[in-house]
Design a protein with these regions (language model features):
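Bacterial N-terminal signal peptides that target proteins for export
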Residues: 1-6
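General helical structural elements
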Residues: 7-8, 269
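GH16 jelly-roll
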Residues: 19-285, 289
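Hydrophobic h-region of N-terminal signal peptides that target proteins for export
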Residues: 10-18
Length: 289
């Protein structure tokens, strides 16, 4: 606990020169409850035909020993949105909730343009676990996805425990359709063996991702219009399988199916270089869906 507080006070960076950066937002998760001024919850079936139903319940989202814990659970509950005979909407087609989990984000509370994000976290090596640290454009309510832009600082798949990935998504200015360069992968690591620092630097020209200071992904941004020139908000979630990934029965959900986040911090340049644009920070700026 003491080390974590010292790091916060000094603004120490992992894998970057601290002199050029200033801390503009952070959460050390040292309290007893999630800070409602910084975070909101996703609830329900949300995206990607994933199996988990997100809740705001303490068994799925809590603070424990100075960490945010997103915990997967096996349950047998009625789906409150179930519609008998539904075939077109996967969120309403499931009568029973078999898995619950947690997802939190800073939408409507904090958004930023350009800077460096660092997050010290531990991922679960459980089959089907899909924890992520990422951002979405705060204009998603008006422009939708993928036009709003998405930065995947970390995606980890529990069934592939020696690999971490990062990526960006946007809308092509040429085709008007979803575009992505494809994930960059770093193999030969063991991210589930303890806490590691996942980082991302975002400028007007590119997004660069790091694992424990190792640079392993760089993505030019000119192909996506202004999606990465506008504020983004932060998301932390633990997805658990999807119908395109594996059968629901094969997803491993037990007490160890937990995504632990020690801290997350956002930095921006004190003096942006001449060929970049200065970063911005905004509160309560994200638009409603």
């Amino acid at each position: 606990m003491g080390k974590r507080l010292i790091l916060a006070a000094t603004g120490l960076l992992v894998g970057a020169a601290s002199a050029d950066w200033r801390l503009v937002w952070s959460d050390e998760f040292n309290g007893t409850e999630l800070d409602a001024s910084k975070w909101g919850y996703e609830q329900g079936f949300i995206r990607n035909s994933e199996y988990q139903f997100y809740t705001n319940l303490p068994e799925n989202v809590c603070l424990e020993n100075g960490c945010l814990v997103l915990q997967g659970r096996r349950v047998q509950l009625k789906n409150p949105d179930y519609v008998p005979g539904e075939t077109n909407d996967w969120k309403r087609a499931r009568a029973v909730l078999a898995i619950t989990s947690g997802s939190v984000n800073t939408r409507h509370r904090f958004a930023f343009t350009y800077g460096r994000v660092e997050c010290r976290a531990k991922v679960p090596a459980r089959k089907g676990s899909w924890p992520a640290i990422w951002t979405l454009g705060a204009n998603i309510g008006e422009d939708g996805w993928p036009k709003c832009g998405e930065i995947d600082i970390l995606e980890f798949y529990g069934q592939m425990p020696d690999k971490v990935t990062c990526n960006v998504h946007g809308q092509s200015v040429e085709t008007g359709k979803h575009a992505t360069p494809g994930s960059s992968e770093l193999r030969g690591k063991t991210p589930a063996d303890g806490f590691h620092v996942f980082a991302m630097e975002w400028t007007a020209q590119e997004v660069v991702c790091y694992y424990d200071g190792i640079r392993y992904g760089a993505f030019p941004l000119e192909a996506y219009g202004d999606a990465f020139e506008k504020p983004h908000y932060i998301l932390l979630n633990l997805a658990l399988g999807a119908d395109w990934m594996m059968p629901e029965s094969e997803v491993e959900v037990d007490d160890g199916t937990r995504f632990e986040v020690d801290w997350i911090r956002v930095y921006q340049k004190e003096s942006p270089v001449a060929d970049d644009r200065s970063g911005t920070v905004s509160a309560n700026s994200a638009s409603s869906k």
